[in-house]
Amino acid sequence: MIEAAMLWNEPNNKSHWDPALDPDWQRFAEHVVRAGDAIHAINPAVTRVLGGMSPIDPHWLGKMEGHGALDAVDVVAVHGFPLDWNLWPLSAWPDKIAEITAVTDKPVWVTEVGVSSFGAEEVQVFGLERTASLLKGVAPRVFWYSLFDLPMSWGAETRHREAEGSSYYRHFYLGLIREDGTPKPALETYAQHAADIGLMQWFHFHDPRLDEAVAWMKRLGTRRIRTGLSWADSFRPNAVDWFDRQMEALADFDVTVTFCFTPEHLGVAPHHTSPARDPQQFADFCAWMIDRYAPAGATSTGIAAPETPPVPPRVPELTPLDFNRDERLAAERSAA
């Protein structure tokens, strides 16, 4: 069951939204306002979440408030990885949330928090236990990132790769389960908190791990999951069949679904981090998904897929199961 719709992922991170194309985030705010209003019109019971900011930045949130975006959401979300990338200590989590509540009275959800096992798996165990003690009772929703390690061959969704240096490889060790399917020590630690802390697991297009993930989450006692439905992926052949399968598999959980990734042919620039030329097209996609998977009544009202210009012959960019890593790195360098 979908309980919440999250509008974009880390919009103040250039890996997910291009500030060169929208330096004041005015366009992003318009995406949020239109999508938030569209979702509310379909089902007012769905909680609308402003995409998890990373870094946690009250000044950016103030900018969103000035653009009117906070009027179209019910919750503000934050992401943090203080033991891996952030320049603040793990113990500062309550302070970081307080920085946001000083700007808005809306609830603050932590929709991604994690600790990699890159250096040592014992560090992940400590980090999970300490994070749980800091955030339980402070944030109404907390989602641990993630259940599975990201396969090395898929590459990480980042435009900071060269700046990250060896820290780039931390992206591939954030799961509670190794790439080979074996559990890490932190999995047992997570199980002790599964009733209160959800999991964030993005399922890529036709992700072969979906059924395994569902089995693990039920075994662990996980109640909530955050995942995503990619706007860009919606233009792939038979995309709706995959979306249906994914949402049916997750029907027994309380789902926060993230809508993001601009289709290349609809962006100001041909990249998934680009603002859409017409933000209403993003809103139409969100409305279509909510009507299909979380209608206000017992059944969908039958909103059809949004009408958009035909997709060019080129396959959409987000193909993590088969992309060429050298090509991606070259693209990152040219866009830097």
Predicted segment positions?
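Active-site cleft segment of glycoside hydrolase catalytic domains centered on the general acid/base Glu
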Residues: 1-73, 79-97, 103, 117-130, ...
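Hydrophobic faces of well-ordered beta-strands that scaffold small-molecule active sites
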Residues: 5, 48-50, 76-78, 108-111, ...
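Extracellular serine-dependent O-acyl
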Residues: 4-5, 108-111, 136-153, 301
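Structural motif corresponding to the early beta-alpha repeats
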Residues: 7-8, 228-231, 242-276
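Aromatic-rich peripheral "rim/lid" segments of glycoside hydrolase catalytic domains that contact
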Residues: 120, 138, 143-198, 208, ...
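Short, solvent-exposed turn/loop segments enriched in Gly/Ser/Thr/Pro and often Arg
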Residues: 54, 143-151, 203, 259-263
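Catalytic domains of carbohydrate-active enzymes, especially glycoside hydrolases
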Residues: 209-232, 254-256
